Amino acid sequence: MSKRILVVEDQPDNRQIIRDMLAGTGYEISEAEDGEQALVAVAKQRPQLILMSAQLPTMDGYEVARQIKADPALRSIPIIAVTSHALNGEEKTARAAGCDDYVPEPYSPRQLLAKIRQYLS
């Protein structure tokens, strides 16, 4: 059985880039375009890992992470924040919201896969 990854990203081009990076890895990829869709997808699909953009419509990625981590049935799902905000303190903000890890953009396919495999191996 393949491992499920939920990609939460509002920009179609960025979702496509991640899909392309993960093509051929054997992971089953699903997507959500905003915070509300992400919460519904997590509850229904129970992915093994979430790649979460920080900036999302309806609810930012950090609020989504907080809500997931507040749910005892979901809190064990690793969340990796993927953000273009490589500012000082952004990683601290991501971790404070409940994200298990952080990948600043731009990142290489190798970097992203290494982070994913760290949690799914």
Model-derived features with residue positions:
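Charged docking surfaces used in two-component/phosphorelay signaling
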Residues: 16-24
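Short hydrophobic/Thr-rich beta-strand motif most characteristic of the beta2 strand and flanking loop
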Residues: 26-33, 41-42
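Active-site residues of response regulator receiver
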Residues: 53, 83
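Conserved acidic carboxylate
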Residues: 9
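C-terminal output helix
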Residues: 107-116
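Conserved Asp/Asn-Gly motif in the active-site loop of CheY-like receiver
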Residues: 32-36, 109
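The feature encodes the CheY-like receiver
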Residues: 57, 75, 87, 105-106
